[in-house]
Amino acid sequence: QRNTAPLFNLSELKYLTAADSNIKTLIRQIDNPLFNEHPLEMGVRGHENEILERFKRDKFYELQFNKLKMPINWQNIKLTITKFVNSLKSYQSPYDQYLKGTYTMTDQQKRGMNLFYSDSLACSKCHSGINFSEPTFLNKNNKVEYYYNTGLYNVNEKNEYPQYDTGLSQVTHN
């Protein structure tokens, strides 16, 4: 239902979801897949105690949380997931190394980079930021603008946009 954030380099993102700009931390974002009913992802809602008891009975998790001197509860489960995900970094591609000055790109890689940044393909106009996934684009004046939800749901009465899912306006009520 919502654009899923990548796991790698997640700590570098300014926005975790285009659907709700109020979510600014991963620990808050984790509530969505765990506890939301629409869309249903992990299906925890209504089963919180049962699932928590499974964690507590599992010897592996008991040992890990004891090492951290943390009780097993939902807040600490979310905190440990956050710490793990924020540790995932992937800045070792040839392009990343080229930007650091530690790699010389091949002619083929240079052609690909030039095409990506070209005006004719305009890939970089939408795929920007450190992870090429910021919800931004360059306007006609080459200034960065952020995407936003237009709220154009069912305007042509052909149900091209689902009426039940109004994205950001569902959160902001605007």
Identify the role of each PLM range.
Residues 1-174:
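Periplasmic c-type cytochrome electron-transfer domains
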